[in-house]
Curated annotation (Swiss-Prot):
Gene3D superfamilies with a match to the protein in the record: F1F0 ATP synthase subunit B, membrane domain
Keyword Cell membrane tagged: yes
Single GO MF annotation: proton-transporting ATPase activity, rotational mechanism
Name of the protein in question: ATP synthase subunit b
Amino acid sequence: MANPIYILAHANAEYLPLESGNSILLPKAYDIVWSLIPFLIILFVFWKFVLPKFQEVLTEREDRIKGGIQRAEAAQAEAKAALEKYNAQLAEARTEAAEIREQARERGKQIEVEMKAKAEEESNRIIEAGTKQLMAQREQVVNELRREMGQNSINLAEHLLGDQLSDDVKRSGTIDRFLADLDTVAPNGK
């Protein structure tokens, strides 16, 4: 097999890359031009199509992030406002509950006073009715006792005198005198 380097070295010497002033680091002008044209085409396509899409995606992401932050801030502000509203309603409800408790306490005291007054009034009425009933019963008992005592005194007088007191006038006069004597003996007997 033939060595390619040997063939290149013995062939036409003016076309060898390392001879006749060709440099690896500095290519020929036609190589630079033909390399620069595709580079510029790729750069133009990149600049015209890829970079705007990339910018659009970046802008969209940035807007989404900013929007997310703004929504989060808005949600946080809304939550804070809702919390303040809730705390205000809670404080108002506590105040209202305290007022209701105080009104109930006052109403309870008022009802207690009214019930005591009604009970006292009812008690006084019952006592008065009882007193009247006792007085009526006392009068009835006193009248019955007077009748019985009058009858007993007549019977006793008839028995002692041995005379019958059949005359109604005599009998009522005797009874009246006896009861009058009895009333003078016990004037405070009521």
